[in-house]
Amino acid sequence: MIHRAIVTKRIALRIGLAGAIAASIPIYAASLPSPAVDESRNEKKTETVVLAGGCFWGVQAVFDAAKGVSSAVSGYAGGSKANAQYEIVSTGTTGHAESVQITFDPSQVSLGQLLRIYFSVVHDPTQLNRQGPDEGTQYRSEIFYTTEEQRRVAEAYIKQLSDAKVFRGPIVTKVAPLQAFYRAEDYHQDYVRHCQQNLPVCANKRYVDYNDVPKLASFRQQFPELVKGGK
């Protein structure tokens, strides 16, 4: 059963359909270039990075559909274990960011490609401590790296995009080492898929339809070669 805390929070949409979609998907001055700097080829079979970019429902849905991603888990990063609970994190006072832990095969999809998706369709990196209708530090834009090479790639891509002025405003995305990741409650996992299937009855379908479904559609349209299963 969907937890009442998210029903209260998500159902109160403050903007209409057009405004919600516009606020949730980045607006560019030009299409995003591929990263000039990416990870070097390695023999690792799996790698993990944690990305924060607003409500984790849509972030998880997009990366779960990406080729080479074996796992996309909604959770919390940037705070302590003691208060890594949705009701507390939602106050915006714990230091956590709603995040998604992405485990991927670098031989199938590179970190640079994942970051291009992240900046293109997952969120608007020019919005400070908010995304669309959601406001608070828990919705901030942040990349939590697990290796120094990931840090190098992330910082280089942010600089590349900033220098190219592809966004109308400055990029506010933070880059920080991952200290810990705390898996979110089960009712948050695969939320968009469950909501689309109405399993269980989705009290937040309007929110998902306005804010998350367009991101997934945009990903499939812009990056068909990176869609899992080619569709």
Segments and roles (model prediction):
Residues 19-25:
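Hydrophobic core
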Residues 2-3, 14, 25-231:
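Flexible coil/turn and secondary-structure edge motifs
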Residues 7-8, 12-17:
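N-terminal export leaders
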